[in-house]
A protein has these predicted regions:
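Short, acidic/polar
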Residues: 12-24, 68-76, 141-151, 196-203
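Metabolite-binding pocket within alpha/beta catalytic cores that recognizes anionic/polar moieties
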Residues: 29-84
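Active-site beta-loop-alpha junctions enriched in small/polar residues
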Residues: 8-12, 35-39, 64-66, 90, ...
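Acidic (Asp/Glu)-rich catalytic clusters
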Residues: 19-27, 45-54, 75-79, 101-112, ...
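Hydrophobic faces of well-ordered beta-strands that scaffold small-molecule active sites
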Residues: 3-9, 32-34, 57-61, 85-87, ...
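C-terminal helical cap(s) of enzyme catalytic domains, especially alpha/beta-barrels
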Residues: 96-102, 106, 205, 218-239
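Conserved anion-binding
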Residues: 2, 69-73, 78-158, 163-166, ...
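Glycine-rich phosphate-binding active-site loops on the catalytic face of alpha/beta enzymes
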Residues: 80-93, 184-187, 195-227
């Protein structure tokens, strides 16, 4: 699964998460995203349970702290054997490099493959006016995202989380194997909710995203498996 469709499991606890997952065939090779709420509620045992079912896991905790703390936390994450995890590019090069080092050290200790480390650039809930007014960033939103992407690559990260609208610029300034994973995916029939730079699965594919993260269009669908299959079909229709 080189370019995955990742389902965001934005549920408050394991009971609701499991109820949702029971609607999928047991042999469906899902790639799921665990965010802060669910991980803080259920802890590392959740990761072990999902891995035992054969799921690939994106642990999205967006680490942002002093370098030593981030390195120690990433060492623990590395031991869990997840596939992707996240860190804030705004933390700077020393923090990013410390996180990458911790992730690899933890994976080595547990004898598992190291996770891909993806840097957060600007959240897809942030528009340019907000960024400039609230963060006192004077450049454009695409320029800020591209800057963070270059910093992430220089700091041992494997890719970034970004809107599909920024992929072309990022890929023009980074290596060919640098990943662009795209949240804020909404089918044409879906409401954008709080994602201000949302695109459809087909648009993301056309913009050469390396993976898409989809939450409510699947988790709140009347038939989640059917919604997942439709999004996956649209995503994979562009070659």
């Amino acid at each position: 699964m080189t370019n995955p469709v990742i389902i965001a499991l934005d549920f408050p606890n394991w009971q609701k998460t499991d109820q949702f997952l029971q609607q999928f065939p047991k042999d469906e090779a899902l790639f799921v995203k665990i965010g802060m709420e669910l991980f803080y509620q259920e802890g590392p045992q959740l990761i072990k349970t999902l891995k035992a079912r054969g799921y690939r896991i994106f642990l999205d905790l967006k680490l942002y702290d002093i370098p030593n703390t981030v390195q120690s936390a990433m060492t623990v994450i590395g031991q869990l054997g997840v596939d992707y995890t996240t860190i804030h590019a705004a933390g700077g090069q020393t923090m990013l490099q410390a996180g990458a080092a911790g992730l690899k050290a933890g994976a080595k200790q547990a004898n598992v493959n190291p996770a891909k480390l993806l840097a957060i650039t600007q959240l897809t809930s942030t528009n340019e006016a907000q960024m400039q007014q609230e963060q006192l960033v004077s450049v454009s939103l695409p320029e800020s995202v591209a800057h963070y992407a270059q910093l992430a690559q220089q700091s041992d990260c494997d890719g970034v989380i970004c809107s599909a609208q920024e992929i072309t610029t990022i890929k023009s300034k980074t290596a060919t194997d640098f990943l662009c994973v795209t949240p804020g995916i909404r089918p044409a029939t879906s409401q954008n909710n709080d994602q201000k730079r949302a695109v459809t699965p087909l648009e993301a594919a056309q913009m050469h995203s390396n993976g898409i993260v989809v939450g409510r269009p699947i988790t709140q669908a009347s038939d989640p498996y059917q919604a997942y299959q439709a999004i996956k079909l649209e995503w994979e229709s562009f070659k």
